[in-house]
Amino acid sequence: MKKLAFSVLCALALATPAQAGEVFGGLYAHDVDTFLTKSGFEDGVDVQIGYRGERIGRTPLQPYVFGALNTSGETSYAAVGLSAKFGDRIFFRPGLGIAVHNGSAGNFQRTDKIAFGSRVLFEPEVGIGARLSDRATIEASWVHMSHAQLFGRQNPGIDNIGARLSWKL
C-alpha cells in the first residue's frame, strides 16, 4: 500500500507543470455524523496541510496532495487527487482522490471505532470559497472517505467538515 501511495504521489508530481502552485492548511471537525456515513464514533480536530499544483494544460484540473493529522489520536490520513476550481472571486471546488489512513481496515462492524473495510479509500471533497487577495483564498470544505462498497459491505465512511486557507506561491 505504501508503494502504491508513493507511486501515485510521484506520478502526480511529474504531471504538475514547473510553475508554483499553492499551499493550504485548515482545521476540520473529525467524523461528523451525516447522511452519508454510519459512523460518528471518533472525535477530535484534524489539522490539514497540503499542496495544490497549477492547472494541468488547458483543463481546470489541479493535482493535490495533503495530510490530515487527528489531534485526538484517532484516524489520520494522506490523500492525493485532482480538483477543479470553478469561479474566481467566489468559487466552487470539487475534487476526487484516494487516501491511505491509519485507522481500522477491518471488515466487521464496531461500536467504538470506524471499521473502514480497506486501508485505501476514495476521497471525494467539495469546497466553496472566496478569493481574499491575488494570492490568498479561504474555503469551507467537506472531505469524505469510503471505499464505496467495492471491498465489502462494511463501509461506514467518514466525513470531515472544516475550513482551509490557501496561499499561492
Outline where the language-model segments fall.
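Cleavable N-terminal export/targeting peptides
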Residues: 1-22
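Outer-membrane beta-barrel architecture
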Residues: 9, 48-50, 81-83, 127, ...
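Outer-membrane beta-barrel proteins
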Residues: 16, 49-57, 83-88, 132-134, ...
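Repeated loop/turn-to-beta-strand initiation elements of outer-membrane beta-barrel proteins
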Residues: 22-23, 56-61, 90-92, 134-140
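Transmembrane beta-strand segments that form the barrel wall of outer-membrane beta-barrel proteins
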Residues: 23-33, 59-71, 144-146
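Outer-membrane beta-barrel translocator/channel fold
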Residues: 27-42, 93-125, 129, 136-139
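Residues that define the transmembrane beta-barrel architecture of outer-membrane proteins
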Residues: 41-47, 74-78, 120-124, 157-161
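Outer-membrane beta-barrel "beta-signal"
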Residues: 130, 157-169
